[in-house]
Amino acid sequence: TIQLSLPYRNMGLSGRVTYAFDDRYFFEGNFGYNGSERFSEKERYGFFPSAGLGYIISNEPFYPESLKKVVSKLKLKATFGLVGNDQIGAKEDRFYYRSEVNLNNGSYGYTWGNDYTGLHSVNGVSINRYANDDITWETSRKTNLGVEIGLFNDLELQVDVYRDYRYNILMSRASLPGSMGLQASIKSNLGEAISQGI
C-alpha cells in the first residue's frame, strides 16, 4: 500500500536531572514526551517519566568500622518508570485513526454473462481496517528494587527484584457478534501482562 512508502514522522522531547550528595545519596530523574504519527490527535502524545534513588549506607558516619572490614559496601537502590511503545500491530496498520479500504478485491466482486456471451467480472470493495481514534500507546510500568553488597573490598554481589506491568496492549476484540456485519476485526488497547522476578 502507499502508506508503506511514506516517510515516518515522530517527535520527541527528553530530559534528565541527576543529583548526588556526599557520595551517599543519589537521585536521577528522566522524562520523555513523545509523539507518534500512528495515533489520532487526542492520543498522539505520551508522557513517560522515570526516577531512581540510591543510598550507600556504608558511607554513613554511623556505619561501624568493624562491619566495614567484612561488608565493605552496602547500597540500596530503587527505580520506577514508564516506557511507551508505538510499534504495535502490523506495519500495514500504520495509521489507526484511518480506515483501510481495498477498492479492488476480487473476493467481493461479481460476475455476469454466460458461456455464449462470455463471462465478465468486476472486483468489489472490502474493508481491511476500521478507523479507531482511541488506539494509543502501549505502556510498560517498570519497578526495580535492588541491593549491592561488597565483601572484603574484593567481591561484589547484586540482587534485584523487578516487576514489569504492561498495559494497553493492542489486541483484537473477540466478543463482537457476527450480526454487526463487520468485515474486519476490531482492535483495541485491551491486553495486560505482568512479568516479575529476581
Task: List where the protein language model places each region.
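Extracellular/periplasmic, surface-exposed regions of secreted and cell-surface proteins
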Residues: 1-198
